């Protein structure tokens, strides 16, 4: 049974979210409260401020699946980087082009109606990339596929993380 479902990681395949995240490096879940908060913060012009993270943090801490993954990262009030990205269909962005050696985590929060594509195990690969105008690095789709990273499509109709 594949753990990857359209609106979240399969609850049937995941009995321990922290162990699952440790193995796959990815966990996503549709969440209407998060979606509404993201939309509200965006409308208020505060989508990427430390204030926005504090608003989301309370609900994140109440979600047992996500809390088990994030709790060691939630001890600081201010994440290192808060960025906002819009739709950029056909582009694959990464934060790093080498396998992760530092203990860091990327938390995405999505507004209602978001569609996202992840690439399985891409965080374990070395890629060539170019600097993108949004501040991230862009990797060619052919390189990701050649690297054996299967596409995982997610639809966050209600929003999520």
Spell out what each predicted region is.
Residues 2-7, 11-24, 30-159:
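Non-heme Fe(II) oxygenase catalytic core, chiefly the N-lobe of the double-stranded beta-helix
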């Amino acid at each position: 049974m594949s753990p990857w479902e359209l609106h979240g990681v399969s609850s049937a395949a995941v009995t321990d979210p922290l162990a699952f995240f440790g193995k796959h490096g990815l966990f996503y879940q549709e969440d209407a409260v998060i979606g509404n908060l993201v939309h509200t913060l965006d409308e208020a012009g505060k989508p990427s401020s430390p204030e926005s993270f504090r608003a989301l943090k309370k609900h994140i801490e109440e979600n047992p699946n996500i809390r088990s993954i994030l709790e060691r990262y939630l001890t600081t009030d201010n994440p290192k980087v808060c960025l906002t990205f819009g739709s950029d269909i056909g582009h694959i962005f990464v934060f790093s082009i080498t396998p992760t050696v530092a203990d860091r985590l990327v938390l995405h929060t999505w507004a209602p109606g978001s569609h996202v594509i992840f690439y399985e195990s891409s965080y374990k690969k070395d890629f060539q990339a170019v600097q993108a105008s949004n501040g991230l690095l862009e990797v060619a789709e052919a390189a990701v596929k050649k690297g054996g990273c299967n596409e995982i499509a997610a639809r966050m109709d209600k929003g999520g993380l």
